[in-house]
Design a protein with these regions (language model features):
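Extracytoplasmic
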Residues: 42-47, 63-66, 83, 99, ...
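N-terminal signal peptide c-region/cleavage motif recognized by signal peptidases
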Residues: 18-22
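Bacterial N-terminal signal peptides that target proteins for export
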Residues: 1-12
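Ligand-binding loop in jelly-roll beta-barrel domains
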Residues: 77, 99-125
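Short acidic-glycine-tyrosine-enriched beta hairpin
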Residues: 52-53, 76, 82-99
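Short, conserved beta-strand element in jelly-roll/cupin
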Residues: 51-52, 63-78
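A short glycine-rich, His/Asp/Glu-containing loop-to-beta-strand
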Residues: 26-60
């Protein structure tokens, strides 16, 4: 194999590898701030900082309790089963009832940042993947 051909092969491999690494970067990150018991037996409150990368999609999912969120920065299109998609922007909040399938997409050029408060069943995962609802 010639030196030039080896460089082409290695270069192509590195470009492909970079694409895989970028493709695997999570679109949504959820960082727990605090978790504590609440007055309802078997429930706990979780406060989390949530970010959706520019162009990122959270993915359809549910929570085992209510989600109350406040958008700190950026914007997103919020898709909630049974409702028309709607845009939420910095300074706005929204509530998603327990078990309702939902998704969010960041169409903006900056990360969408929000604070999410979840009042959920103790011991359950904070979020579970779900199928997209029928149109």
């Amino acid at each position: 194999m010639t030196k030039h051909l080896k460089r082409l092969v290695v270069g192509g491999f590195l470009v492909a590898l970079a694409g895989v690494i970028v493709a695997q970067a999570p679109a949504l990150t959820r960082t727990m701030v605090t978790k504590a018991d609440v007055s309802v037996p078997g429930r706990e409150a979780v406060v989390a900082r949530v970010e959706v990368a520019p162009g990122g999609v959270a993915g359809w999912h549910t929570h085992p309790g209510d989600e109350i969120s406040y958008v700190i920065d950026g914007e997103a299109t919020l898709m909630i089963a049974g409702q028309a998609p709607r845009k939420v922007v910095a300074g706005e909040g929204f509530v998603i009832p327990a078990g309702v399938v939902h998704n969010a997409k960041n169409d903006g050029s900056v990360a969408t940042k929000l604070v999410g408060v979840y009042v959920v069943e103790k011991g359950k995962p904070l979020a579970s993947p779900a199928s997209a609802p029928a149109p």
